[in-house]
Regions:
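Non-cytosolic membrane-interface motifs at loop->transmembrane helix junctions
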Residues: 78, 165-176
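Bulky hydrophobic segments
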Residues: 1-164, 182-207
Length: 207
């Protein structure tokens, strides 16, 4: 129960963190996307635009979780983790794959599971992005593995400039999460295709 509450606390923190950015991002995105559609002179495909919009919003969420500063009237602008700590892991540079697992037991015993939240979060963080990107653009699995690793590498390198930890394990789990999201997207497409084939075809002249 404590672990679930901790997960909810982190989600609540990052949801509130996004609010100032959403107020700026949504109008700019709609304006830019509208101009792009008008310039192309082609009819808008609502479902495709909806998926693109969700992908853009989720990309903003990833940035809010990883690199964007907290903006609030009471605290001003600051770069930090959510309230709490992941323990000894929560600092510096870590370049040994699998080293993060050493802190799971310590975190579960003394810190309420913060490290486990981070591990699951790193694995799941890129999964929705992989799913939405697959639904928007398709592509091969290795492209998503490389994209996940590349995006995560950029984030980890940028975090060298911030009071946050830079960890090779984050990159690994982010890339695997992106790949997992890709396969979820493919699975969804296949299920939707089978469902479409299973529906009875409309007889010409009906209705």
């Amino acid at each position: 129960m404590k672990f679930i509450l901790l997960c909810l606390d982190y989600l609540d923190y990052y949801a509130r963190l996004m609010l100032p950015y959403l107020a700026v991002f949504i109008p700019l995105y709609l304006l830019a996307r509208g101009c792009w559609i008008l310039r192309r002179g082609q009819p808008m495909e609502f479902r495709h635009e909806l998926k693109l919009g969700l992908l853009a919003l989720y990309a903003l969420f990833v940035l809010a979780v990883t690199v964007l500063p907290e903006i609030s009237l009471s605290r001003g602008i600051r770069f930090s983790y959510a309230e709490g700590s992941f323990g000894p892991h929560n600092a510096g540079i870590q370049l040994i794959p699998g080293n993060f697992l050493r802190y799971l037991g310590f975190s579960l015993k003394y810190l309420g599971g913060g490290a486990l939240v981070a591990l699951i979060g790193n694995l799941c963080l890129f999964a929705p992005m992989g799913f939405l990107a697959q639904r928007c653009f398709g592509g091969a699995w290795w492209q998503y593995l490389l994209a996940g690793a590349g995006i995560s590498l950029g984030i980890e390198l940028f975090q060298l400039l911030l009071p946050r930890a830079t960890d090779i394990d984050d990159l690994i789990f982010n890339a695997l999460g992106m790949l997992g999201g890709y396969f979820l997207g493919r699975g969804y497409a296949r299920l939707a295709g089978r469902r479409g084939h299973a529906l009875p075809k409309k007889v010409k002249g009906d209705g």
